Amino acid sequence: MLLSGMRESQGTEVSLRTISTQDLRLLVSFAYSGVVRARWPGLLRAAQAALQYQSSSCLDLCQKGLARGLSPARCLALFPMAEAPGLERLWSKARHYLLTHLPAVALCPAFPSLPAACLAELLDSDELHVQEEFEAFVAARCWLAANPETQESEAKALLRCVRFGRMSTRELRRVRAAGLLPPLTPDLLHQLMVEADVPGQERRREPDRALVVIGGDGLRPDMALRQPSRAVWWARAFRCGVGLVRTVEWGQLPALPAPGRFRHGAASLAGSELYVCGGQDFYSHSNTLASTLRWEPSQEDWEEMAPLSQARSLFSLVALDGKLYALGGRHNDVALDSVETYNPELNVWRPAPALPAPCFAHAAAILEGQLYVSGGCGGTGQYLASLMHYDPKLEKPGTFLSPMGVPRAGHVMAALGGRLYVAGGLGETEDLLSFEAYELRTDSWTHLAPLPSPHVGAASAVLQGELLVLGGYSHRTYALSHLIHAYCPGLGRWLCLGTLPRPRAEMPACILTLPAVQHIALVPTPHQTKPAG
């Protein structure tokens, strides 16, 4: 108001008749410090004050803080501010949270206060992410039970947003058993189910970013022998059919140069440039690669860049502060402790401070701008449970933190919601299904719901607030996997999202911005008529 050219900016004094002492103190403090010190409820009040008194920089800061701490109850608390100008970005994130956590949201005491039109819009959205359509019915039933004054016509309009035609026979039996609470009659539910007697419209989610899977160890088209893959796929949409049937629409990007590679690293810079380096192009240790490839949307094919100084496989490649870091790995059956960093502007790899000890088949992730390395195999082949903070700016860059609950290698690690998540891999004697989360503030690990099936040498990515684990193999059976499992922290469970176009293992996955790949044509995938897993 005082700096935007309004009439008050020209006066010698301004009368603020409605501002509270608390709001004035907060805004003046922010004007001098650029900081808002508050927990989530305080941030919400600060955002309301910043919105009312047009402090755009304070509002932006509050929105970032509010978006990081979303929960079912907090999303419902944001709804009264949903249509306020300037809060579109925050409400978009809150709406997405509601769509992906509806079963948990329906259990909140504030859920019945959600307007019927808003709930109907959520239930009718293709973006609604539920394990089965019965969960959408349960949410509608809970809301109607808490709002008995709802007119029958309004209740019918709300229930029509539930896609009964997508339900399996088992789900429909559960719907009939649950019924509707008075004053709504059983005839209303029967009428809606008769109307939906034909298969209903599937739910089709199109992510705002592209999941890309690069190469890997697979099978030849005749399924006779294993063969390193050249294929590069990206997921265009996730589809939910009848019951538990899940499929993924896959597109293809330009293939890797022959003969393909696996046990390699891949990372994205700026969300649009994809780098692939190292790995193996065959199954002998002498087939370890040092080459680096780059692809961006303006290119029809992969471009060869400066090679790694040290050929390596089974290593981690991460992007940090605009550079790439290749950590550890294996060459000629020898574990490596060396680290290299790539400068994309100079197209050169340079040595970085070495790891405290050699390791391969480990995992790495970036959490709050810091690089962490977990597990793997040591120089003598022993399985590691370590977690290390690696700071390339230090002469001795490795700081060991609290170890994982179990030693593992060939696992995945990703940062999500301020925590590090570690899943799957191989233990000292068998496949690991265990799943752990690391809390940085307390330097402690928590065991969570285990993986539904083995994923050794799998790819991982974080997409739309979920941890995705893709492909891999089982050490017990040596069978390759094509399953994609997703973990949603707010619901504490794993869901199967569908399958890869082909079973694959020992490959990486990356996230690219959608405009970078959306012009690439889709490739057909077989129609799936049974649950993926």
From Swiss-Prot:
Segment forming the signal sequence: none
Chain positions of Kelch repeats: 210-258, 273-322, 323-369, 371-418, 419-465, 467-514
Database matches in Gene3D superfamilies: 1.25.40.420, Kelch-type beta propeller, Potassium Channel Kv1.1, Chain A
Keyword annotations of the record: Kelch repeat, Repeat
Highest rank taxon of the organism: Eukaryota
PANTHER family, A to Z: KELCH-LIKE PROTEIN 33 (PTHR45632:SF14), LD33804P (PTHR45632)
Protein's UniProt name: Kelch-like protein 33
Organism for this UniProt entry: Homo sapiens (Human)
